[in-house]
């Protein structure tokens, strides 16, 4: 085996691999034997086609398999000799198979970089003070979040913006109903812009039981092409009008939330708000320190690592949307984009995240930080508690999905990264 390794930009390397006829022959014979077992060639019984015929009929397939087998057999030695740390799959660029084999491929490797000085970094760290006004604001939010819709009993009451109506409707286009344009009982908050055009505003002033007809125009970019940009008429009927009624802030309200009294609720709210705000301030401070460190650390980030981070973010968004009953494509269409455009928008933040992870990983390695069994067990207990279970139950659940070891590895990684962050903070001015 002969090879050459050439450094490319973005922490990629190009490898030119040469195998002599003697070295590549066993690989070719093995691939031909496998292809020959399954190949169906006119004029020959299955499994009896000559090698020359197979090479002609299945040239691309055979060359690809030979190349992959050759890389799998020889690349580990190259990695070891050149001290490479691959972070992506091999990308084949050129295959030249005759008697001998010449391959050209590239692969992303863990970037080599000089870490900037993280000792003595400076960043502003704000302070937090809990005030009566902030407590009042937090309690008001809590009350609003526990407001309930109650039907308006006054038969003459006219619907207003911010009211919620129980609505029956049927849509027509050119006098004919269209699919998906009918409902017998749909809750709609007026002014929420949930419906197209000025549909909601036209319902202002309606009373319970009132029927009518409104005209709207579908937006030009509407997801259903057959409706996009066209006018439509809706027959409507108000089944009921509802208003949000907020509970009174008193002991009874506190007890509904599981507290002994309003005073206890206030004390707990102060405590939780103080922790939340101090955590936010700490996160902003750490982020500012890491931004400073990034300014003094040049890293040629591999494209594959950025793409992997983008994919992680897309999967997380897809999961969150599925929990709300949305499909990713439909959501992005409503936002005026698609997966490709959204991925491009995510790229700068994804690259920054990868850079920070690489910096923290280097700090962790330089300081020999590791996650102890005790730290892992403690974190597993905290996670289990979040899900309302004990550690054995959590581990059993993870085993069902064959994800226990990966999960523990991820937890260990987070522990080590936290130690690296603490090291940066400890050494800041």
From Swiss-Prot:
- Broad EC category: isomerase
Q: What is an example of a Pfam family matching this protein?
A: FKBP_C
Q: Single GO cellular component annotation?
A: cytoplasm
* Subcellular locations according to the entry: Cytoplasm
Main subcellular location of this protein, as a coarse class: cytoplasm
Look up the EC number in the record and give it: 5.2.1.8
Query: Among its keywords, does the record have Metal-binding?
Result: no
> Known Gene3D superfamilies for this protein?
3.10.50.40, Trigger factor ribosome-binding domain, Trigger factor, C-terminal domain
The UniProt catalytic activity note for this protein reads: [protein]-peptidylproline (omega=180) = [protein]-peptidylproline (omega=0)
From its record, what is one biological process in GO terms?
chaperone-mediated protein folding
- What keywords are annotated for this sequence in UniProt? Cell cycle, Cell division, Chaperone, Cytoplasm, Isomerase, Rotamase
Function recorded in the entry: Involved in protein export. Acts as a chaperone by maintaining the newly synthesized protein in an open conformation. Functions as a peptidyl-prolyl cis-trans isomerase.
UniProt remark on domains: Consists of 3 domains; the N-terminus binds the ribosome, the middle domain has PPIase activity, while the C-terminus has intrinsic chaperone activity on its own.
Q: Which family does it belong to?
A: Belongs to the FKBP-type PPIase family. Tig subfamily.
Query: What is the protein name stated in its UniProt record?
Result: Trigger factor
The organism named in the record is Fusobacterium nucleatum subsp. nucleatum (strain ATCC 25586 / DSM 15643 / BCRC 10681 / CIP 101130 / JCM 8532 / KCTC 2640 / LMG 13131 / VPI 4355)
């Amino acid at each position: 085996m002969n090879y050459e390794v050439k450094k490319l930009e973005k922490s990629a390397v190009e490898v030119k691999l040469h195998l002599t006829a003697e070295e590549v022959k066993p690989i070719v014979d093995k691939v031909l034997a496998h292809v020959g077992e399954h190949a169906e060639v006119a004029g020959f019984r299955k499994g009896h086609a000559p090698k020359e015929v197979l090479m002609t009929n299945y040239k691309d397939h055979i060359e690809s398999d030979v190349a992959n087998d050759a890389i799998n057999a020889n690349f580990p030695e190259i990695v070891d000799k050149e001290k490479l740390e691959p972070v992506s799959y091999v990308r084949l660029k050129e295959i030249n198979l005759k008697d001998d084999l010449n391959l050209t491929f590239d692969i992303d490797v863990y970037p080599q970089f000089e870490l900037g000085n993280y000792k003595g970094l400076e960043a502003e760290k704000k302070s937090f003070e809990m005030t009566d006004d902030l407590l009042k604001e937090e309690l008001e939010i809590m009350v609003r979040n526990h407001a309930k819709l109650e039907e308006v009993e006054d038969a003459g009451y006219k619907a207003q913006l911010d009211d919620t109506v129980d609505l029956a409707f049927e849509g027509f286009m050119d006098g004919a109903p269209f699919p998906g344009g009918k409902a017998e009982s749909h809750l709609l908050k007026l002014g929420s812009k949930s419906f197209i055009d000025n549909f909601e505003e036209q319902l202002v002033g309606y009373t319970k039981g009132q029927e009518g007809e409104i005209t709207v125009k579908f937006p030009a970019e509407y997801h259903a092409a057959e409706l996009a940009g066209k006018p439509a008429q809706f027959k409507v009927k108000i089944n009921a009008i509802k208003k949000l009624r907020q509970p009174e802030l008193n002991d009874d309200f506190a007890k509904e939330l599981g507290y002994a009294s309003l005073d206890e609720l206030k004390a707990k709210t102060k405590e939780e708000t103080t922790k939340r705000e101090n955590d936010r301030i700490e996160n902003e401070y750490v982020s500012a320190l890491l931004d400073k460190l990034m300014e003094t650390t040049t890293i040629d980030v591999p494209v594959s690592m950025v793409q992997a981070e983008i994919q992680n973010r897309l999967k997380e968004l897809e999961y969150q949307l599925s929990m709300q009953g949305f499909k990713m494509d439909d959501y992005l269409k409503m936002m005026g984009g698609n997966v490709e455009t959204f991925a491009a928008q995510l790229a700068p933040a994804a690259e920054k995240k990868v850079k920070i992870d690489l910096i923290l990983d280097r700090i962790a390695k330089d300081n020999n930080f590791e996650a102890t069994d005790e730290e892992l067990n403690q974190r597993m207990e905290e996670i289990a508690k979040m899900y309302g279970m004990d550690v054995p139950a959590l581990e059993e659940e993870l085993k069902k999905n064959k994800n226990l070891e990966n999960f523990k590895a991820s937890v260990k990684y987070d522990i080590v990264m936290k130690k690296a962050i603490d090291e940066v903070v400890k050494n800041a001015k």
